[in-house]
């Protein structure tokens, strides 16, 4: 993997900097590095493909070295270099694709394609010029079963979940009380509602709670907490739990009271925030517990009192909500996030070449399925293919 990264980095630099008119002295170190790559690769043969619709391709390396010059690089020099660069870029692209479409239930962190296994041999270590990629660093750590750490922006840590629970229900569905939520990606939105606006509740207050368990521990997380859940702020028709009927939800938004968010790790509270909104942080956690209250307004103008009568029919439904959004965090496991396209790259390649469903990844690389059942085997394989996707993205956009 280190060698593949160094190949890609060298080729990217060569493609960007070996251009007509450039002073040789400005790129002499790069050309020496490029020639070392050629010396190491010359005389070797590789084969890629042969899975799904990915065609078999054979690769042979026998290239002349780039020479020295006292002046600027001329058109002939650049054309010779460009032909070599293009062949190598095509080779690296195919090695990456060949690796991204393979998976293994055992030791999935290790190279799975014949071509990358061969590049892992000792004779190619002379190509290992650069090991500065976060993905490469973490791949090396994971390969040695040491602690890794990925920094994510808006990590997709929450499997998609959209549902409701009813704490009070009637056959006519005209006087309900309960909780609705939508968890997806890096965001939780939860709303508590009471058709009667807590008219008969103790102290005219209803208590709500929403607990979300993460599939992986997050550390040093920056989080936004807002006293609103905009996705539940408009009328809708909701299917009943048994699917036999539907019920009408017509929210009128109130501000939540006594809001508390707890971040827990292995059942122990690590951080707690009460009535604090905006930006908060959490040290390390695997569970989030949100609790909040709906309090019937003690003093109401006639217009507000008309919204919340003391008896049925309840045409407007008192609702309070919270939004929790993980802006950034560190995780030992690789995740899809908002700042990278690794999941899309891997998924599109597997779809393009009609790769059959293997023993590890779900059909279509369904992220909700993958993160819901994030086994060690999936973690190893995902880190490997994401690392390869990051290498490929240096050359192929």
From Swiss-Prot:
Annotated residues for binding of Ca(2+): 266, 286
Coiled-coil parts of chain: none
GO terms for MF: host cell surface receptor binding; metal ion binding; structural molecule activity
GO biological process: fusion of virus membrane with host plasma membrane
Any single Gene Ontology cellular-component annotation: viral intermediate capsid
Chain spans, region Interaction with the inner capsid protein VP2: 62-73
Keywords: Calcium, Capsid protein, Intermediate capsid protein, Metal-binding, Ubl conjugation, Virion, Zinc
PTM: The N-terminus is blocked. Sumoylated with SUMO1 and SUMO2. Sumoylation of viral proteins seems to have a positive role on viral replication.
Pfam families: Rota_Capsid_VP6
Localisation per UniProt entry: Virion
Alphabetized InterPro entries for the sequence: Capsid_hemagglutn, Rotavirus_A/C_VP6, Virus_capsid_a-hlx_vir
Domain of life, source organism: Viruses
Sites where the protein binds Zn(2+): 153
Note: The VP6 trimer contains a zinc ion located at the center of the molecule. The zinc ion is not essential for either trimerization or transcription activity of the DLP. Zinc-depleted VP6 has an increased sensitivity to proteases.
Assembly information from the UniProt record: Homotrimer. Interacts with the inner capsid protein VP2. Interacts with the outer capsid glycoprotein VP7. Interacts with the outer capsid protein VP5*.
Family: Belongs to the rotavirus VP6 family.
Protein role: Intermediate capsid protein that self assembles to form an icosahedral capsid with a T=13 symmetry, which consists of 230 trimers of VP6, with channels at each of its five-fold vertices. This capsid constitutes the middle concentric layer of the viral mature particle. The innermost VP2 capsid and the intermediate VP6 capsid remain intact following cell entry to protect the dsRNA from degradation and to prevent unfavorable antiviral responses in the host cell during all the replication cycle of the virus.
Name of the protein: Intermediate capsid protein VP6
């Amino acid at each position: 993997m280190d060698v593949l990264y160094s190949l890609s980095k060298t080729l990217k630099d060569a493609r960007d900097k070996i251009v007509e008119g450039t002073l040789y002295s400005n790129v002499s170190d790069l050309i020496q590095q490029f020639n070392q790559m050629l010396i190491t690769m010359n005389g070797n043969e590789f084969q890629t493909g042969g899975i799904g619709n990915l065609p078999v391709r054979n690769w042979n390396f026998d290239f002349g070295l780039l020479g020295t010059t006292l002046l600027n690089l001329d058109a002939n020099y650049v054309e010779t270099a460009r032909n070599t660069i293009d062949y190598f870029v095509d080779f690296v692209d195919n090695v990456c694709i060949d690796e991204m479409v393979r998976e293994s239930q055992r030791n999935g962190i290790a190279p799975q394609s014949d071509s990358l296994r061969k590049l892992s041999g000792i004779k190619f270590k002379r190509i290992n010029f650069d090991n500065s990629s976060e993905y490469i660093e973490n791949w090396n750590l994971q390969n040695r079963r040491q602690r890794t750490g990925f920094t994510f922006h808006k990590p997709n840590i929450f499997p998609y979940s959209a549902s409701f629970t009813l704490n009070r229900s009637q056959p006519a569905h005209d006087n309900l009380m309960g909780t609705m939520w939508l968890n997806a990606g890096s965001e939780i939105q939860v709303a508590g509602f009471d058709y009667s606006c807590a008219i008969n509740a103790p102290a005219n207050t209803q208590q709500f709670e929403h607990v979300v368990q993460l599939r992986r521990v997050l550390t040093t997380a920056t989080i936004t907490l807002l006293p609103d859940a905009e996705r539940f702020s408009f009328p809708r028709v909701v299917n009943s739990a048994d699917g036999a009927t539907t019920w009408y939800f017509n929210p009128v938004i109130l501000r939540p009271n006594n809001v508390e968010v707890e971040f827990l790790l292995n059942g122990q509270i690590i951080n707690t925030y009460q009535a604090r909104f905006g930006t908060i942080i959490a040290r390390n956690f695997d569970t989030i517990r949100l609790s909040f209250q709906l309090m019937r307004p003690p003093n109401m103008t006639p217009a507000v009192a008309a919204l919340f009568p003391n008896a049925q029919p309840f045409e407007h439904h008192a609702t309070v909500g919270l939004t929790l959004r993980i802006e950034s965090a560190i995780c030992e496991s690789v995740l899809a996030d908002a700042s990278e396209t690794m999941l899309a790259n891997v998924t599109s390649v597997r779809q393009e070449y009609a790769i059959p469903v293997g023993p590890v990844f779900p059909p279509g690389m369904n992220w909700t399925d993958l993160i819901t059942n994030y086994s060690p085997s999936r973690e190893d394989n995902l880190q490997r293919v994401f690392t390869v996707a990051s290498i490929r993205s240096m050359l192929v956009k």
